[in-house]
Amino acid sequence: MGAEPAEKAPVGASPTGASHTSGSAGSSGGSSSGASSSTPSTSAPTTPSATVPSHVPVLPGSSVTGPATKLPGYTDSAPAGEPLAWHAGSPRVEVSGGVDAFAARFDPGAVRFELHAGSQVPGGSGWPGGNAASTSGLLAGWNGGFLMANNASWGGFYLGGHTAFGPLRTGTASEVFYKDGSMDVLAWPGGLPSTDVVGVRQNLALMIDDGKLAADLNDGTAADERTWGFTNNSADVHGNRSGIGVTVDGKVVYAAVHNASPLQLAQYLQRAGAVRAMQLDINFTRPIFGTYADGRWTEPAPWLGPAGRFTSGNERDFVTVYTR
């Protein structure tokens, strides 16, 4: 596939939102720095709280109308503006939507999440896990956010005691990964990661916090690009977008929308139940998501990038989901 134009960062100051108190992510110690180890000790996160069942063939709360093993082909039966209708997809994955907008929901009691460093972003050596994920127990995966070079993402990357692209930025929206395999989405509270945090991927500001949409989500105006990133067409802020969030009961929700504004992505995440959420990637086939079963990847929409990169070796950071 041909080379894609480089991403352009939003303009303006980095976010400075207050920390969220849902879980213990950072400590009050000083800023983390490149290739440094974290030492502060704090309590384990309270959200999400993972209780690992011995066997979970279908997630709690699924509205299963028949056998379903593949992600594509579902129709969102909920009227516009109402909560999404969920279905059982691949084992331990709930899904909703179709080819223009879809969401996947994961219960941290049934699955675990892993952050991976890419061979080029963040690059370098010594990162745990490698840039090609194991297929043992693999369920799904998605790619990270904006390029972290030149402050495009308003933040940094932390994994296995080391950071890249400067210290983690206070207030920046962050995927936070814990030792127990759970994850959270929150505004980084500042300081070094606590000892129960194994990974952090930062990107822009929260789109949703405390169940409320961010005040600077403008429906298709130029202000959107200054905050949420420039699209392929400078005259139109609509593009392919992905995001990640958490529900009030700790489930993790991934969503992707086709040719949509930042507000439309945030509204879709909100309909999926997210009370905190952040944008991940935008434009072209940069948003990547797939489910893994029977030795192969399945992408739910043709405008997504190939998820096979996650097991063959990916140049940029990504997240994988495994069965517990």
What is the predicted function of each stretch?
Residues 1-30, 34, 39-168:
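Zymogen propeptides
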Residues 20, 47, 200, 207, ...:
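Pepsin/retropepsin-fold aspartyl endopeptidases
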Residues 93-98, 179, 248, 313:
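Short, ordered beta-strand-loop transition motifs
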Residues 99, 170, 239, 312-316:
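Short, solvent-exposed loop/turn segments at the edges of secondary structure
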Residues 102-106, 173-177, 242-246, 287-291, ...:
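Short beta-strand scaffold segments in enzyme catalytic cores
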Residues 107, 116-271, 275:
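Aspartyl protease catalytic domain
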Residues 284-324:
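C-terminal regions of proteins
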